[in-house]
Design a protein with these regions (language model features):
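Positively charged n-region of N-terminal signal peptides that target proteins for export
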Residues: 1-4
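C-terminal motif of bacterial Sec signal peptides marking the signal peptidase cleavage site
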Residues: 13-16
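Interaction-mediating elements
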Residues: 18-258
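Sec-dependent N-terminal signal peptides
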Residues: 6-8
Length: 258
């Protein structure tokens, strides 16, 4: 009996091993993403994390989770009554040979198995234009936050056979922007004195490439500096911060007002 069950399960599993089984007629299954930065294949793992859509998870080179999902069917009945209506011959056969209790038990088992496949499997990742647009926005914001204010990001869909496609992202970073003068305007002499005493520890230094992360670190550093010296109610919101030149000139430098 055990061998028969295993054979039955394998037959079902192999019959589901079409990755496009649940892909609509006008849909495309995401096979792969590619990212090219300045005409070179991307090696920055941070960019991969910005992809809104990623292909179905693979195990041993196969999208097993997708295959499991394909064994299920969202349109199958979810109650014994629905199951009996859609599968009257099977329901009545078991009822007549054994009992209605066995028919109900069998129906519940089939419903539970179907739901298990849907819950533990992974639905096919269908390419969506709005998610590609969101990815482009993510990639653009990432580079601007790292000083590439003139970055250009584009996408293209490479359609392949069997309802599959590759989404290609192309990024032209442009030249980075560097920090020029760091200007402070601290009206309180006490606060100014504290700031100047540890200015050498600043995360913002002339000549460094603009990085949003360094501004966040600097805001935290100044806040902790003041709080550790008795200015307990000082917050990052009290900083007149991020007064960065809005018009980046051809020199690719920007002043920072603090």
């Amino acid at each position: 009996m055990k061998k028969i069950f295993i054979l039955f399960f394998l037959t079902l599993f192999l019959s589901s091993c079409s990755s496009i089984k649940r892909v609509g007629e006008d849909d495309l299954l995401l096979k792969q993403n590619t990212i090219v930065v300045d005409e070179k294949k991307n090696t920055n793992s941070d960019l991969n994390e910005l992809l809104v859509q990623k292909p179905n998870i693979k195990t041993l080179g196969l999208p097993l989770s997708l295959y499991f999902y394909n064994l299920g069917d969202k349109n199958k009945p979810n109650t014994v009554n629905e199951w009996g209506i859609k599968k009257p011959k099977t329901y009545n056969f078991i009822k007549n040979i054994f009992s209605e209790k066995q028919s109900i038990s069998y129906a519940n088992s089939m419903i539970g198995l179907n739901n298990w496949f849907l819950k533990n499997g992974q639905a096919p990742v269908i390419i969506k234009d709005e998610k590609i647009t969101k990815t482009i926005s993510n990639l653009t914001a990432y580079h601007k936050n790292n000083g590439y204010f003139r970055v250009k990001a584009q996408s293209s869909i490479e359609v392949q056979k069997n309802k599959k496609a590759i989404v290609n992202y192309t990024i032209d970073k442009g030249r980075p922007t560097f920090l020029d003068s760091i200007i402070t305007n601290i009206k309180s002499s006490v606060l100014d004195s504290l700031y100047q005493s540890q200015k050498s520890l600043s995360f913002l230094k002339k000549g460094d490439q603009f990085k949003e992360a360094n501004f966040i670190k600097e805001a935290s550093r100044i806040t902790n500096l003041y709080r550790n010296n008795g200015i307990y109610h000082f917050t990052e919101n009290d900083l007149g911060y991020y007064n960065i030149d809005s018009a980046i000139t051809n020199s690719y430098k920007t002043n920072v007002d603090l």
